[in-house]
């Protein structure tokens, strides 16, 4: 559906002139823009209550970018599968979604996204998770990072009150 304008229903409701006016003002607020696609992986994500990107009440996000070279993609994928299995075995309360870099990204990476109420809640659940996984988890993370070419993390928040999703017809 890359050829479809997902904002078309909004433009139709607002009118082209009003819609353009919003973006004319918005365009003065930043100087760089890029588009890319990441693909959510059900196979690699750990969300025992069902895979969803809408984690109500948990709008804080921690994004872990695991950059990988082509020769290590499969090895890293296998370690992420092992990590998911360990989370399942231990009944971890910290859930994560895994995305894979796709169209428009520079470099290849797996992206692990963890939701929490706020930064303090993230630290608390991460500490509890580390304690739960113990030495087995520590070793698995060390093994996994042998295949990571570069690591970056970012944190931020979601704004559901500012979100727009076109209705499906």
Descriptions of predicted regions:
Residues 1-138, 142-169:
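Short S/T/G/P-rich N-terminal loop/turn motif that feeds into the first structured element of a domain
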